């Protein structure tokens, strides 16, 4: 990506093609990773009806986690290709070619963010199922995540959201960030045993980085709703430029 960024300084079109290849590879890795995790968590030689179950998926490698590679690939491809006019959904493919999408890039980002939040809560739900939801704290990310998924998806469907819609969305994303940071603290506390720090517990017990994915989704959601038009000041006059 650093090389592509340097190339973009002189040839944006060539850099875009390069990063597209990289992000397609990321999507491929994500899909393959999810497949291998599912296979690792099943019993292919077991009798029919017992080869896959919820219990197997709970204790299997995280089946949803690799899909984040695929979502990052989609985000990257969407970001790499410029929108001819902000919020028009018309991508500039170079050479005078354009691709008209059914949604603007901003709305497409919101749809992808809602899918990413859904993947996050599914992964968290499977992880927390290992403790049978006995701790009331583990219910918080589930409820907040479900609400955030609905709010983000709903905002993506609105062509002209109101101020109230935006306020609810921003508040929800802020809640996601708080939940992520709080979850990371609770996971670290769970991994610390007594007065000693055992590295193995950080590897085998509560994953202290996993809750930060909630915070990442919250930050991403806030970035998505920023004004897609960049404005620079030239002799005191604001000039709109394509994002």
Give the positions of each predicted feature.
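Core segments of alpha-helical transmembrane spans in multipass integral membrane proteins
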Residues: 1-7, 24-34, 114-115, 119, ...
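Hydrophobic cores of alpha-helical transmembrane segments in multi-pass inner/ER membrane proteins
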Residues: 1-4, 62-83, 143-154, 208-227
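C-terminal TM-helix exit segments that contain a strictly Trp-centered aromatic cap at the helix terminus
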Residues: 28-44, 79, 124, 175-191
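Transmembrane alpha-helical segments of multi-pass membrane proteins
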Residues: 18-33, 100-116, 167-182, 243
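Membrane-interface helix-boundary motifs at transmembrane edges
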Residues: 10-18, 97-103, 158-166
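Membrane-interfacial, low-structure loops and terminal tails that flank and connect transmembrane helices
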Residues: 83-108, 234-243
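Interfacial non-cytosolic loop connecting adjacent transmembrane helices
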Residues: 36-59, 186-208
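Transmembrane alpha-helix entry/boundary detector in multi-pass membrane proteins
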Residues: 1, 58-62, 105-106, 127-147, ...
């Amino acid at each position: 990506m650093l090389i592509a960024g340097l190339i973009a300084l002189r040839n944006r079109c060539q850099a875009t093609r390069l990063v597209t290849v990289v992000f397609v590879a990321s999507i491929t890795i994500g899909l393959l990773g999810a497949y291998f995790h599912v296979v690792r968590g099943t019993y292919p030689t077991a009798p029919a009806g017992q080869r896959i179950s919820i219990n197997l998926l709970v204790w299997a490698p995280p089946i949803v986690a690799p899909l984040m590679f695929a979502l990052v690939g989609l985000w990257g491809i969407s970001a790499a290709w410029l929108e001819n006019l902000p919020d028009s959904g018309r991508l500039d493919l170079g050479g005078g070619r354009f691709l008209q999408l059914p949604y603007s890039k901003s709305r497409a980002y919101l749809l992808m963010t809602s899918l990413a939040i859904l993947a996050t809560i599914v992964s968290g739900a499977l992880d927390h199922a290992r403790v049978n939801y006995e701790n009331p704290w583990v219910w918080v990310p589930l409820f907040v995540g479900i609400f955030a998924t609905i709010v983000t998806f709903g905002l993506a469907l609105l062509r002209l959201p109101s101020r109230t819609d935006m306020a609810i969305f921003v508040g929800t994303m802020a809640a996601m960030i708080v939940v992520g940071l709080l979850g990371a603290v609770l996971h670290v506390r769970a991994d610390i045993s007594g007065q000693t720090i055992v590295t193995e517990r950080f590897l085998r017990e509560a994953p202290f980085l996993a809750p930060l994915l909630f915070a990442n989704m919250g930050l991403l959601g806030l970035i998505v709703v920023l004004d897609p038009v960049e404005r620079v000041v030239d002799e005191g006059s604001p000039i709109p430029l394509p994002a």
